[in-house]
Amino acid sequence: MKFYLVGGAVRDMLLGITPKDKDWVVVGATEDEMLANGFIKIAANFPVFIHPQTKQEYALARSEKKTRNGYHGFEVNFSKYITL
């Protein structure tokens, strides 16, 4: 299980700004492993979790494939074998 800082926190750090919050992508884990490590699942359709102490957001790595027009036309794959 590896954790990668992503999103606005990375941008802020590159600009010399202290991030207000931190979001993470998790590689090499399953939903069950995250739950077993005390993370709290917060999204019904996506494996997104909150760390129990820091309250920071952790999302499992995923791949997306466009299958139809519009915002809902995606096939999403979550696997512990997806890498960045």
Curated annotation (Swiss-Prot):
Pfam families, alphabetized: PolyA_pol (PF01743)
Enzyme class: transferase
The enzyme's E.C. designation: 2.7.7.72
Highest rank taxon of the organism: Bacteria
Signal sequence bounds: none
Transmembrane segments: none
Binding site for ATP: 8, 11
Keywords: ATP-binding, Magnesium, Metal-binding, Nucleotide-binding, Nucleotidyltransferase, RNA-binding, Transferase, tRNA processing
Residues at which Mg(2+) binds: 21, 23
InterPro entries given in the database record: NT_sf (IPR043519), PolA_pol_head_dom (IPR002646), tRNA_CCA-adding_enzyme (IPR050124)
GO molecular function: ATP binding; CCA tRNA nucleotidyltransferase activity; metal ion binding; RNA binding
Chain sites annotated for binding CTP: 8, 11
Keyword Transit peptide: no
A Gene Ontology BP annotation from the UniProt entry: tRNA processing
UniProt key word Lipid metabolism: no
Catalyzed chemical reaction(s): a tRNA precursor + 2 CTP + ATP = a tRNA with a 3' CCA end + 3 diphosphate; a tRNA with a 3' CCA end + 2 CTP + ATP = a tRNA with a 3' CCACCA end + 3 diphosphate
Function of the protein: Catalyzes the addition and repair of the essential 3'-terminal CCA sequence in tRNAs without using a nucleic acid template. Adds these three nucleotides in the order of C, C, and A to the tRNA nucleotide-73, using CTP and ATP as substrates and producing inorganic pyrophosphate. tRNA 3'-terminal CCA addition is required both for tRNA processing and repair. Also involved in tRNA surveillance by mediating tandem CCA addition to generate a CCACCA at the 3' terminus of unstable tRNAs. While stable tRNAs receive only 3'-terminal CCA, unstable tRNAs are marked with CCACCA and rapidly degraded.
Family per record: Belongs to the tRNA nucleotidyltransferase/poly(A) polymerase family.
Protein name: CCA tRNA nucleotidyltransferase
